[in-house]
Amino acid sequence: FTNYVHRVYATHDGEVYPLPINLGTINQFFHAHYTPAEAQKLIAGQAGELAGTDPANLNDKGIQLIGRPLYEAFIKNYTGKQWQTDPSELPAAIIKRLPVRFNYDNRYFKDTWEGLPADGYTAWMEKMIDDPRITVELGVDFFDESQPYNKTALKAAGVPVVYTGPVDRYFDYELGDLKWRTVDFKEVRYDEGDHFGCPVMNFSDADVPYTRAIEFKNFNPERHDSQNPNKTVVWEEYSRFAERGDEPYYPVNTDADKALY
């Protein structure tokens, strides 16, 4: 594995800020020099009546965690683009994954070890399944009864199955469709060696139609000498509701969805 450490940045109102929200983000946003204790007091005050509570929905949890000004700058519109669902109807667990730090640590994760497969995920997966006891079948439709490894045949044979697809599809939508989000990617090529200077750039403002952009070469700085110094590839992510036949990425998981299944 490489020694890659994941860091994310966000644009808001013409400026670039470090994520997750940390003391650097707070001081830059408020043009201040708060100490950790001062920043904690500030955020608690800006959380208002939600301070010290444990809200169940994303909107209130976001305000409780980082105060209303930071929530409206970095989370509200980004969430609107990503989910197209009123934040008050989304579970708080979505934003609980985003840490808030009252220091200058801008690592996205707190794991002891981080890294990416040195030869890429394809080589990594190929090694994992390189065993005579493992057979990989591609292009198989689990729900097509004309194919050997289909749901009906495997169930009749009593074969244990770990199904990782949409649960509503598994039950043939007999209880209705769940809401899922999917992502469309737009590839953009730039005639420059590095466009963002980081692997992931979030776009927090509503006037930018995509949620974030990924610049792949920045995931592998150890390959810098072998990369094209005059070209770079960026993928912009556009989030929308998934329809049947789309690849679902995220369950919306509203109370209505949870009540179905």
Question: Language-model segments: which ranges?
Answer:
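Conserved FAD-binding subdomain of flavin-dependent enzymes
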Residues: 1-4
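Aromatic side chains
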Residues: 9, 71-74, 78, 83, ...
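Mid-domain catalytic core of redox enzymes
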Residues: 140-261
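Short linear motifs in exposed loops
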Residues: 20-21
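Active-site/ligand-binding neighborhood in enzyme catalytic cores
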Residues: 6-7, 15, 24-159
